[in-house]
Swiss-Prot record:
PROSITE patterns: RUVC. It comes from Aeromonas hydrophila subsp. hydrophila (strain ATCC 7966 / DSM 30187 / BCRC 13018 / CCUG 14551 / JCM 1027 / KCTC 2358 / NCIMB 9240 / NCTC 8049). The active site is at 8, 67, 139. Keywords: Cytoplasm, DNA damage, DNA recombination, DNA repair, DNA-binding, Endonuclease, Hydrolase, Magnesium, Metal-binding, Nuclease. Binds 2 Mg(2+) ion per subunit. One of its GO terms (cellular component) is Holliday junction resolvase complex. Its cofactor is Mg(2+). Mg(2+) 2 binds at residue 67. InterPro entries: RNaseH-like_sf (IPR012337), RNaseH_sf (IPR036397), X-over_junc_endoDNase_Mg_BS (IPR020563), X-over_junc_endoDNase_RuvC (IPR002176). It catalyses: Endonucleolytic cleavage at a junction such as a reciprocal single-stranded crossover between two homologous DNA duplexes (Holliday junction). GO terms for molecular function: crossover junction DNA endonuclease activity; DNA binding; magnesium ion binding. It comes from the Bacteria. CDD domains: RuvC (cd16962). This is Crossover junction endodeoxyribonuclease RuvC.
Length: 173
């Protein structure tokens, strides 16, 4: 059993999603958004760090996955997003969690089946895959998508390792 924390970073809203892997299946544990005040950027970055640290303390994840920076419409937005990512990553590293990063295309491909999926499609598939009774907010759904992408990627790597080592289904004979 392992717990994965997925993060969809932002300088205003950072989504988080937590899943537990039991017997090769993902179970929903929690999700939500860290909303920062409208203050100066350094203060907002501290709020992201503190929020992610609280989530780590609450859920005690074994692994941490985060969305990579994409090229935003302007350089200032991309820099702020990168700094918010850095704040979240530092919280994970301080908690001694392994950090994995995925592009938006990889996440959409893993969750929806196409790298060009719309946010609504990600929300729908996250709701379906985790058997949720209600659709999560877009940022929380994206973060759950990050966690699911990490889980699926890890499963593929385990299967590939099993084939190359002579093991069966990721286990040695």
């Amino acid at each position: 059993m392992s717990i994965i924390l997925g993060i969809d970073p932002g300088s205003r809203i950072t989504g988080y999603g937590v899943i537990r892997i039991v017997a090769g299946k993902a179970e929903y544990l929690g999700s939500g958004c860290i909303r920062t005040d409208l203050g100066e950027l350094p203060s907002r970055l501290k709020q992201v760090y503190d929020g992610v640290s609280e989530i780590i303390t609450q859920f005690k994840p074994d692994e941490f996955a985060i969305e990579r920076v994409f090229m935003a419409r302007n350089a200032d937005s991309a820099l702020k997003l990168g700094q918010a990512r850095g704040s979240a990553i530092v919280a994970a590293v301080n908690a001694l969690l392994p950090v994995s990063e995925y592009s938006a295309t990889q996440i959409k491909q893993a969750v929806v089946g196409t790298g060009g999926a719309a946010k609504e499609q990600v929300q729908h598939m996250v709701t379906h895959l985790l058997k949720l009774s209600a659709t999560p907010q877009a940022d929380a759904a994206d973060a759950l998508g990050v966690a699911l992408c990490h889980f699926h990627t890890r499963q593929i790597l385990i299967k590939m390792a099993g084939r190359s080592t002579g093991s069966v289904r990721g286990r040695y004979r």
